[in-house]
Structure formats: structure tokens, C-alpha cells
Amino acid sequence: MLRRLPFYPLLFALFPVLSLAAHNIQEISVDLVYRPLLISFLVGLVVFILMQVLLRDWPRAGLITLIFLLFFFTYGQVYDKLKSLSPFTLSLFRHRTLLPAYGILAAGLMWLVWKKLKQPAAWTFGLNIFSIYLLIYPLFVISSNIVQQWSADAALKTSTLRPVSGAEKPDVYYIILDAYGRQDVLRDTLHYDNSPFLDALRERGFYIADCSQSNYGYTEYSIPSSLNYDYLETLGAAAHKDRIALLKHGAVRSFFEADGYQVVAFPTGWNITEWTDADLYIDYEHPITALTEFETLFVKTTVLRVPIDLRSVNQNTASRKDLRRLRVLSLLANIKKLPKVDGSLFVFAHLVIPHPPYSFGPDGAPGQFQRYDATDQEIAEAYIDQVKFIN
């Protein structure tokens, strides 16, 4: 089988997705890999079968399919690499020059295999073995991460705190507004007075910590620390996988679960802060054309980078900003309904706002701020618009 049947094109079709997933496994959920993996496999399968129908020669069809896959899946990476070499290559290698050159190279190699290669079957065994070898490392990285995550989660299932029996159990909301500035910082740095909103909260019985400071400067460090009542150094969470386990199944969550609370969570667009295994995980309605951030990253490594950069993609395709708007608006709409849910709730709501990219105007309309060359003043105004909206 290894010597006669060229199955390597199908394994090569899987490699780009698995390799990218392994490289980013600390930032993504494994379920984000399934759709692009299936599509990549189908691309390889369809091209392979089509070549066999045309050529009536499995070994030759396999080699031509491999050339096509290499062209299709590496174009975006080659494009980025060439543009990063020097200012000269930045202007030289544009899509209008690189795409034809890359296409001619691929077509030339295909022609050589079709017309000139005498014994295509001689390549089958070596390429079959190499394709298997190619998948070993990414599959090992991905599976190891899954096992480590399971182990870390299991170790955190038991909280050191115990609920007080018989006590009243009100709903508890832990709402995080990512990158929301303190009043004095907003006033002194951005010249925005947020005191009317804070005073309104005080009138409703809220406590405002006027001189509060974040425990850490990054979400991956800050939230796990907060959800476990201690600093990460004390908790022994130096590794990324340990911090994620502390975030998703930490002491606070375990405490409420042990006391009979239902855990409620929402999608954030970032796997690290998504509690998809919550008792009630309230997702939003995804546009059928929407790509996840992992899928977008993957697509940009392929030849599909060209229509993306040329902005010729169907206008119905949801952008990253559009999806962020949908997530935020869905969370705000659904969190209002939770008081009607029976039982005691612990609600974990991480809203990536006013954190950029800036998706909202002050009244909630889509924000118009998109330019990369914006001035500091324009950036400040866009940030304040997010604050005004979320208030």
C-alpha cells in the first residue's frame, strides 16, 4: 500500500491546518480546527480525483495534486516572507507580480510531471512516508496539550473554600470590561469626565475603588489571579497551560459550583476566557459566512490572501470587528434576561470593550474608526466612544 497507493496528497492537505493549530494551540480551542481541516482535506481530495480522471494515472495525479497544494497553501506565507526581507522587496513583491510568477512556476512543474517525468510511481513510497512523518509533530503537540489541559482541569476541581450552608444565595455577576480605564486616568490622560456614571453606580449601592490597579497588565495573567484569590507566583502558574486551567476551573468557579450555583458564561472570541462547559453557555447567532479568528489566520497563509488583500471578498462576509460587535451586543441583550432564570447563578461575563479594535460609536452604532494611520487624538476619541457606549 505504501509503495503503490499515493495517499500522500490527502495527508499533505491536512498538514497546513494542523501545523498552524499546533503553533497556536495555547491560544485556540481544538474545536476551531475541525472546519478548516475538513475543508482542506476536501480540497486535496477533489483535486486528486480530478487529476486522476484527467490523467488516468494515480502516481502522476498525486504529484500534480501535491504541486497544486503547495502552491495553494504556501502563497500567503511566501508573500509575507518576501515583503519582510527589505524595503526593496516590499515594493517589488506585490500580488500583481508574485501571483503570476508563483502560478507560472506551479504550472511549469505540473507540466514537467505530466509530460516529462518517466516513472512517477517511483516517488510514491517516499512521499507517503514523508507525509506521515510530517503529521507526527503537530498531532503530538495538539494531543499533548489536550491531555495536559484535562489533567490541569481535574486538579482544580476541588476548591479549598467551602460554602456556608443555609446562607442566602443571591446571583453573582463577575463582569470584566477589558481595558476600561480608571476615572483619574480618563480625566487626566484622555480629558474625559466619567464621574457622572460612577456617581450613578454609587447611588445604586455599588462600591467604586477610586485608586484600584490591575494585578497584572495582561488578561491571561490578570483573570486567573483574580479567580483564585492570589498571585500567580504563589499559585505556581508559570506555564501557560496552568494559567488557562486556573482561569477556566479556578477556585472561585469551584466554590460556586460546590454551593449549587449554575455557572453562566458567554463567548468572547478568545478561547482563553470562554467557558464553553458552563451550565449555561449563551452563544450568539453566527453569520454563515463568518470565519473564526483561527480560520482568518489560516486563510491568509493561502492563495486566498489575494482577494482578502484586494478587498474583493463578498461584502456579506463578517469582519473581525463585526463579530466582536455581535458578541458584545448579544451578551448585553442576554445578560438582562438572567434574573428570570430559576436558581442561583454565577455569571462570568468578559466583554472585550473598550479594548480595541473599536467597534462602537457612543450610541452603539458601528464605529467608523478603522484607519491604521490615525492620530493619537483620533484614537483617544474612539476609545472614549467605547466607554460612553458600554456605560
Predicted features by range, described:
Residues L2, V164-A167, F256:
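Structural motif
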Residues L2-W150:
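Transmembrane and membrane-interface helices of multi-pass
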Residues P36, R162-G166, R187, D242, ...:
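Short, charged/polar micro-motifs that form catalytic or ligand-binding hotspots
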Residues K118-I129, N145-K169, T189-Y192, P196-F197, ...:
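Cytosolic-biased juxtamembrane loops and peripheral soluble domains of multi-pass membrane proteins
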